[in-house]
Curated annotation (Swiss-Prot):
Keywords: Cell cycle, Nucleus, Transcription, Transcription regulation. Its main location: nucleus. This is Protein BUR2. It is found in: Nucleus. One of its GO terms (cellular component) is nucleus. Component of the BUR kinase complex involved in transcription regulation. This complex phosphorylates the UBC2/RAD6 ubiquitin-conjugating enzyme (E2), leading to monoubiquitination of histone H2B and the silencing of telomeric-associated genes. Also required for histone H3 methylation. Necessary for the recovery from pheromone-induced growth arrest in the cell cycle G1 phase. The kinase activity of the complex requires the presence of BUR2. Overexpression of BUR2 interferes with mitotic chromosome segregation. The gene is BUR2. One of its GO terms (biological process) is DNA-templated transcription termination. Belongs to the BUR kinase complex. It comes from Candida glabrata (strain ATCC 2001 / BCRC 20586 / JCM 3761 / NBRC 0622 / NRRL Y-65 / CBS 138) (Yeast). It comes from the Eukaryota. One of its GO terms (molecular function) is cyclin-dependent protein serine/threonine kinase regulator activity.
């Protein structure tokens, strides 16, 4: 019993086992670049090392047939680890850390696989890329190597959990997962039902597919340290919308208040912020990895360009329309308007069925 209020306080007898962390995961462009250091030779060596680790993550994605959002999560955790703790200049040690990061991402985002699956594929990567393994020589004993990699994985996984402070469910980092949630079948069937058919059936499916690709390709640069997943989703839609306008339909424009309707209530950023983030993204590309997937000058996006493909009353702010908010509905907060909407959808489906019969 609480002596002051006379009420039962469960935390006195059963305190929280782990205090929920609130870590900082978003940084300025300057902070990210400064993390590389000022020594030219060490910076070049570190970037080469990081690029090899990113190659490893992509190799594991293909080898284990991982979902896109699992690969994205692994990349997010990799850059966060690098920013806070750095990487060993020993390539094999960094691969071991990357392996633990990948396993943690799999456990966070999807069903875990047997540990042997990770170890086997990691050994294959090390062998294919001829990464030196101690004194084992160019052709190490695979059975011995697997046991060594297995032991390192178990050790590093425990270490990683502590280093991240058990903060793996921030909920705003994984843009690849978020874009599927924002445009899930539920929302397409309800919230987006009023959108023009030409946009829903012709333009948007192509833009959405390209946006998914934009997000996955973005994981090869530390852009996840620059902005959260929600902003990166909006950036992907803006970028791919501009590309669609340039390559397919010169008159393309998103429907009125499209972004205001799909954003969460807590989100609010203006066009200028998006322009600055695109520019910072380009600066990161110039300072980190020279890859075929880099967007280069296409990231020079102005406010005018964004306004030419959007039509928002309140910039990029939520419209406060909670009618189709799945989180509210799941908690039982269902409005009369939503019930009437569902009834109209059921009636329409029934009439469509009758005409076929």
């Amino acid at each position: 019993m609480d002596e002051q209020t006379g009420t039962f306080n469960p935390r006195v007898l059963w305190p929280d086992v782990i205090r929920l962390p609130q870590n900082r995961w978003i940084f300025t462009c300057k902070e990210i670049i400064d993390r590389l250091g000022t020594d030219v030779h060490k910076t070049a060596e570190m970037k080469k090392l990081m690029e090899k680790c990113l190659m490893y993550l992509y190799f594991m994605k293909k080898s284990l047939n991982l979902f896109d959002y699992t690969y994205v999560e692994a990349s997010i955790l990799f850059f966060r680890y690098w920013y806070y703790y750095g990487l060993s200049y020993n390539l094999l040690d960094s691969i071991h850390i990357s392996q633990a990061i990948l396993v943690t991402a799999c456990k966070t985002m999807e069903n875990n696989r047997p540990i042997d699956a990770y170890v086997k594929s990691t050994c294959e990567f090390v062998t294919i890329h001829k990464i030196p393994v101690g004194n084992a020589g160019p052709r190490p004993n695979m059975d011995k190597l697997k046991w060594e990699f297995r032991d390192r994985l178990v050790k590093n996984e425990k270490k990683l959990l502590c280093q991240f402070g058990f903060d793996f469910n921030d909920g705003v980092g994984n843009a690849r997962e978020l874009i599927e949630e924002i445009f899930s079948g539920f929302y397409r069937f309800n919230r987006d039902d009023i959108l023009p058919d030409e946009f829903k059936k012709t333009a948007f499916p192509k833009i959405l597919q390209e946006s998914r690709m934009f997000i996955v390709q973005g994981m090869t640069q530390p852009v996840t340290l620059l902005c959260d997943g929600y902003k990166f989703v909006v950036m992907s839609l803006i970028y791919c919308g501009l590309e669609y306008k340039r390559l397919v339909d010169k008159n393309f424009r998103y429907p009125k208040n499209f972004f205001s309707r799909v954003l969460l209530p807590s989100l609010k950023f203006n066009t200028q912020e998006l322009v600055e983030t695109f520019m910072d993204y380009r600066i990161l590309e110039d300072n980190f990895f020279d890859l075929k997937s880099n967007k280069g000058s296409k990231l020079h996006i102005s406010e005018e360009m964004i306004r030419n493909i959007t039509d928002e009353d309140n910039d990029f702010c939520h419209s406060n329309e909670e009618l189709f908010d799945y989180e509210h509905i799941r908690e039982g907060n269902v409005s009369k308007e939503f019930m009437e909407h569902i009834q109209s959808k059921v009636d329409a489906m029934y009439e469509k069925y009758k005409t076929k019969v």
